[in-house]
Amino acid sequence: KTTITRLVNGLIPQFYQGELQGRVLVDGQEISSRPMYQIAAKVGSVFQNPRTQFFNVDTDSEIAFGIENEARPPQELIERVEQTADDLRIQKLRNRNIFELSGGEKQKIAFASVYAMNPQIYLLDEPSSNLDMTSIQELREHLRLIKKQGKTVLIAEHRLYYLMELADRIVYLEKGEIKGIYTPEEF
């Protein structure tokens, strides 16, 4: 399942080697032919271990990082960080040292950094793995929010119970093969 997310966000074959058969299309364009900056503008990824995607020590800088890379004006950075914190209700995590956060709080900041960039596609790899029950409920609300915004969401996940009312389709994989595609009702 992680391999699929790495294909969609362009990490395979650009950063992870292997034999690639077939094509991965996003908006009708083959991912392997697009430069990473174009993919990153369209596809936002939240990895299972959020520490692997952090580039800053404090939470506000981390949330702003992707926007800064788009060379946005400073005032827009400030506004987007504030709007993200408001939309996701994570004000209590602002201006904190990332190394002092719990695993679940780090996951929330990783999600917020992607949300601030406003991608069309969200890729989440095991987003509930570091979360307690309350945080899983918050994650569900965040997913409901981005779905309402018309975003595409692809989630690689073992825990499905919290996604059943949100999912349009569930793709069941076993040993790297698609064994079935279901609606939540069929699953």
Listing of model-derived features with the role each one plays in the protein:
Residues 122-125:
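Catalytic Walker B motif of ABC-type/P-loop ATPase nucleotide-binding domains
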Residues 75-93:
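Conserved ABC ATPase "signature" region
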Residues 23-38:
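ABC ATPase NBD Q-loop/coupling interface
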